[in-house]
């Protein structure tokens, strides 16, 4: 998800969803609608899935706008071009354990601004300028236990729903057909 602010009241929000490294949804703040893309078009997710994704991403957009405002205030930054990028999700490991992640990038820095470790729960400062935000969020921001629940429970439930649909997609495909033609070539003839 990315939010950019180029002047007061004018911002852009874009979220892309990936499943198994393939894009399956796109949401932008202008249309305020989650739409299937790529793999999502092939998956039979149903209208209620896209309505739920739209509702969830509208809330994520609101949260990112609030986070960007807080970060800009803590950094003493006003008008101008600013961006906040959030990468969050969960991965189902081979042993069926879940790895959740949430990384924030601010103003196109080459490194993360803040990261969340779902094992130990704290926000980790990736740059010294993020320390003020970390302290603010530890007292007033997203509670670590709720973030962990989102990454390990809510996200995993969504992952299982998509996985079930994806498996159905694979099961409903016809097996590939191959035609082989063989002819004898006599030596010296083509």
Q: Regions from the language model: what does each represent?
A:
Residues 1-190:
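Extracellular/lumenal regions of secretory-pathway proteins
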